[in-house]
Regions:
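Membrane-helix boundary connector in multi-pass membrane proteins
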Residues: 107, 157-168, 175-192
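Juxtamembrane boundary at the C-terminal end of a transmembrane helix
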Residues: 201-215
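Hydrophobic cores of alpha-helical transmembrane segments in multi-pass inner/ER membrane proteins
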Residues: 63-73, 120-132, 173-179
Length: 215
């Protein structure tokens, strides 16, 4: 298995321990800041001229958080760092979001909703470890990339053949962006995009994303 992983994507170069710590600390702070922003926007209305951004609804959805986690994972220096950075991001996000909720908003968070995000935070290092290989080469990279693109496709589109359409334009942008950040070369990216179509249809018609709590 290690041979397959190393063949898919190799760790390039080493970074110093202080720099690694700073990167993880930044991920933690970034997550905390995003959590605070998300809750602030949930409780406060933006000026009317910014309504078109729809930031409150956007950050209340799952897709942007998964997209940030994917970016942190694939652009980390190693799969281990990917897991650490993504975990730090989600821990920071949860702390920021729920501290703001309980201290400044004056009420306690919904427990089932909190548990969903706690579970995602716990499993995120293992998922990020695998996602790091999506920017590698070969069948494994294509497979991981196609699943990721398929997930964003499910967020972006209504995949009912009788009513195919974009569901939410910001998530359509994230779908396009996911293709961009996972791009390796034209041939490999084309394979990933093609394979993502049946994967997305499978996810949609089995309801798997809803079952695992991210749909």
């Amino acid at each position: 298995m290690l041979k397959i992983l190393n063949k898919t994507r190799k760790v390039s170069g080493k970074i110093s321990v202080p720099k690694q710590i700073m990167t993880t600390f930044f991920a933690l702070l970034f997550g905390g800041g995003m959590g605070i922003v998300a809750k602030f926007l949930d409780l406060n209305r933006l000026p009317s001229f910014l309504d078109w951004l729809d930031l409150s609804n956007f950050l209340g959805r799952t897709a942007p958080w998964i997209f940030i986690a994917v970016c942190l994972a694939v652009f980390s220096k190693s799969p281990l760092k990917a897991g650490i950075n993504v975990f730090a991001f989600f821990v920071g996000m949860l702390i920021g979001y729920y501290v703001w909720t309980s201290v400044f908003a004056g009420f306690y968070p919904d427990i089932p909703y909190l548990m969903r995000w706690l579970i995602l935070a716990v499993v995120s290092p293992f998922l990020a470890f695998l996602i790091w290989y999506a920017r590698g080469r070969g069948a494994l990279a294509i497979g991981i990339s196609s699943v990721l693109i398929a997930i964003f496709c499910c967020f972006a589109f209504n995949l009912n053949f009788a009513d195919f359409r974009i569901l939410y334009f910001p998530e359509f942008i994230l779908w396009l962006a996911s293709i961009g950040i996972l791009f390796k070369d034209v041939k490999q990216s084309a394979f990933s995009l093609l394979i993502s179509i049946p994967v997305a249809l499978s996810l949609e018609y089995t309801g798997l994303l809803t079952i695992i709590g991210i749909g």
